[in-house]
Amino acid sequence: LLLSDECPYTIKMAIYPDNTKKEFLDTKETSISSVLEQLEEAFRYIKLNNKVKAKIVGINRIEVPEYNEEVIRECLLNTIGHRNYEIPGSTLIHIFKDSIEFLSLGGLVSGLTIDDIKIGSSSSRNPKLISILHRLGYVEAYGSGIPRIMETYKLSKEKPEIIVAPNSFLIKIPKLDLDIDTLTIKNLLVTNNTITREDIERTLGIQKTSALKILNKMVEDGVLLKEDKGKSTTYKLNN
């Protein structure tokens, strides 16, 4: 039934102008179709409402969305992959001014805690569905979704919030509160263990003073570690 074109377990979404549910700007419910089609439909709707910040560096345009698209997809996969389909009702997604909430029916599988899933422990009430999602490439590794979401916010002051009740599971993701420069430096450190001031100057197209200001602020905030090596100073993520 879940993979048929007549799956009745829809996803209902609403957009709000602020951080309350007093009034909404728009609503949408996915069509009665397979959970995979509903996943893609919901993703497209959220993506349309995911604002993008942009910066021009030389001839390049750097774009940073308010919400990481991989995080959105992981949250959607979690809602359809682990919900309790014995409980009738729709998955709910609330798009607020500063956050998005994904609320699915069914609490944690017996024996698991929030701390367990944050470090990657996995147990599903829908093993066949998860297996299909894995074979189709939607799920890369069992139990990796929540840890990947948390890792994305490693440099952010605001962190995702998980609330579990006996019959529901909510994950709330905040807007990424990092500026474009900080996000660019973070992405640079994904492929490089260390960086130098000169790397930042070239990547961001800025002068020495501006590069040092950004790096020093990230060191003060505890995001980066500064390592003096004689004439060379390098920076790395503070794990």
Report residues per predicted region:
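C-terminal regulatory or interaction extensions
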Residues: L1-N239
